[in-house]
């Protein structure tokens, strides 16, 4: 009977617990790095998605703006200017009159520039060192009415066609004053200022062109004077012949032939 008790004791003994495998330090660092990489990848993806959405929204806004007519853009510009003025008025109740006038002038100038952009096309407001300085034309009666001509594409020509357009715009504005006393003096000074930045070879070409034009003008004036002299001489000759004929007729009517009434007796 003793062996059976031993068997029971052996069956009742439980197996020893298995000790868990210990993780090494490098394994824990690898898991942390993997989690960081995953977080960085997700952050990069979110940034890419945000940039793509922003670019798409900007492109959609530009496309919608291009589809708008000029009248719609002008109307939106007026509404935007009115809204901006109202906001500035509400925010600057305590400002003095001088500051208010200066602010209104700046706002009007910005509004006029935007209005000119709507009328004449896109304006490059990112001026660099080579860009011309601002040429602001203001109304003497209302100083707040001012326009920067240098910002208009018309006054920033680069191609031959653009220079031709500039010429066709300025000439009709200037030549009507050619009969005024100071026009010729102004034209001389204006021409000097125009060629001031050119080299001597280009100035010589322009001077040669002016000489050619001067010679043509002289020929035209001489031809006109010659025609005028011929016409005047012809009129003088006709006048002399007519006067002589009238004198002869008058002498005949008056009996100025040297014969008296007694000569026939």
UniProtKB/Swiss-Prot annotation:
The record ties this protein, via InterPro entries, to: eIF3-like_dom_sf (IPR023194), eIF3j (IPR013906)
Q: Where are the coiled-coil regions?
A: 61-95
| GO-annotated cellular components | eukaryotic 43S preinitiation complex; eukaryotic 48S preinitiation complex; eukaryotic translation initiation factor 3 complex
- Ranges of Basic and acidic residues composition bias in the record: 45-65, 73-86, 216-228
Residue ranges annotated as compositionally biased, kind Acidic residues, are 1-12, 26-44, 87-97, 251-265
Top-level taxonomic group: Eukaryota
Q: Where is this region: Disordered?
A: 1-113, 212-265
GO BP of this protein: formation of cytoplasmic translation initiation complex
User: Which keywords are on file for this protein?
Assistant: Coiled coil, Cytoplasm, Initiation factor, Protein biosynthesis
Localization, per the record, is:
Cytoplasm
Listed under subunit, the entry gives: Component of the eukaryotic translation initiation factor 3 (eIF-3) complex.
The family assignment reads:
Belongs to the eIF-3 subunit J family.
Provide the function of this protein: Component of the eukaryotic translation initiation factor 3 (eIF-3) complex, which is involved in protein synthesis of a specialized repertoire of mRNAs and, together with other initiation factors, stimulates binding of mRNA and methionyl-tRNAi to the 40S ribosome. The eIF-3 complex specifically targets and initiates translation of a subset of mRNAs involved in cell proliferation.
- By what name is this protein known? Eukaryotic translation initiation factor 3 subunit J
């Amino acid at each position: 009977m003793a062996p059976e008790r031993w068997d029971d004791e052996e069956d009742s003994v439980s197996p020893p617990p298995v000790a868990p495998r210990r993780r090494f330090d490098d394994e824990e660092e690898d898991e942390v790095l993997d989690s960081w990489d995953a977080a960085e990848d997700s952050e990069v993806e979110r940034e890419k998605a945000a940039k793509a959405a922003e670019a798409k929204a900007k492109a959609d806004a530009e496309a919608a703006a291009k589809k708008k007519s000029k009248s719609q853009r002008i109307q939106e510009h007026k509404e935007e200017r009115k809204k901006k003025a109202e906001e500035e008025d509400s925010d600057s109740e305590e400002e003095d009159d001088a500051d208010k006038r200066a602010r209104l002038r700046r706002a009007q100038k910005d509004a006029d520039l935007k209005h000119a952009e709507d009328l004449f096309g896109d304006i490059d407001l990112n001026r660099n060192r080579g860009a011309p300085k601002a040429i602001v034309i203001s109304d003497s009666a209302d100083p707040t009415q001012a326009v920067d001509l240098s910002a208009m594409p018309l006054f920033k020509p680069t191609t031959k066609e653009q220079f031709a357009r500039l010429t066709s715009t300025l000439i009709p504005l200037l030549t009507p004053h050619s009969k005024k006393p100071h026009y010729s003096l102004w034209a001389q000074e204006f021409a000097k200022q125009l060629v001031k930045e050119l080299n001597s070879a280009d100035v010589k070409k322009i001077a040669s062109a002016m000489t050619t034009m001067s010679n043509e003008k002289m020929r035209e004036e001489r031809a006109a004077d010659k025609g005028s002299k011929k016409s005047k001489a012809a009129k003088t000759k006709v006048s002399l012949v007519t006067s002589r004929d009238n004198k002869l007729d008058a002498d005949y009517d008056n009996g100025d032939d040297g014969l008296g009434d007694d000569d026939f007796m």
